[in-house]
Amino acid sequence: MKTYLPQTWTDPRIEFRESPISGNGMFAREPIKKGESVCVVGGIAMTDAEFADFQATYRNYNAIQIDDHLHLVEDPQVTRILEGSMNHSCDSSTWMADEATLVARRDLERGEEATVDYALFTTQSNWMLDRRCRCGSPHCRRIITGDDWMREDVQERYRDHFSPFINRRIEKLRKGSLHDS
């Protein structure tokens, strides 16, 4: 199995502060160019069953889905969860370079919030954001679910920049051969 950073790495040009979207978000202290790494998610790889047990114990945590039935979960004992996290936007300023690396989708200006569309790494059909989206984008979906990656508008917006396992699923969908893994 691939190894991941024990903790999330965040570009030093990023700072955590209050966000109009939700809680504390990640903001550019200095400009960040399109394609530059914003953060690399670290943590513990967990199966669906392990992740379900984890969710039953912890309410506040950061996690991303990295493959079918596999999640990368920051250890709440060592994470900066209270500091903040990357907020969702339906027109995100970052996208996936691989299953754990978020890069700038476009140039980020000083003071701009770095955001990610959770559809880029979430496929759990039973998952839904615990509040209505407040991203303010003209593309706002309002209700954010684990099935949003299947929407054609979302697939077009982020073409080939989802987590690799979702890119593979989308390719299978386009070929008409997706079977739930």
Where are these regions (language model features)?
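Catalytic cores of histone-lysine modification enzymes
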Residues: K2-A97
